[in-house]
Amino acid sequence: MNWKAVLIFSVLGSLASCASYSEHAVQRIEAGKSFAVTGNTKRINTMACQDNDDWYLDGYRVGKSFREHQQKMLSQRTAYCEEQTGKAVPDKFRHSWNSGYQQGLKR
């Protein structure tokens, strides 16, 4: 391989690693591990995917402390639970999360 090819591959590799991050991109979350909410805030994943009360309480916490990340947090939780259960998240859980979120906004 000549120096031009090496230079081209190096530049392409650098550009690929600098791909922009979408504000609503879903981050991969693992059970019991922390995950980023913002650049300097993390949460620990203790999600109980089939527990309606857990969905409500998570929404409440997001509404109270992370309101500007509403869509991101709900998307992360939904993606995690769909991956864990292999099924779509029932609407009742999203409804509970949104109810909790609205209550959290009031606090």
UniProtKB/Swiss-Prot annotation:
Q: What is this protein called?
A: Uncharacterized lipoprotein PM1897
**Cellular component per GO?**
plasma membrane
Species, as recorded: Pasteurella multocida (strain Pm70)
Q: Which domain of life is it from?
A: Bacteria
Q: Where is the lipid attached (S-diacylglycerol cysteine)?
A: C18
Tell where it localizes: Cell membrane
Going by the UniProt record, its keywords in alphabetical order are: Cell membrane, Lipoprotein, Membrane, Palmitate, Signal
Report the membrane topology from the UniProt record. Lipid-anchor
Give start-end of the signal peptide: 1-17
| Lipid moiety-binding residues (N-palmitoyl cysteine) | C18
- Asked if the record carries the keyword Lipoprotein, the reply is yes
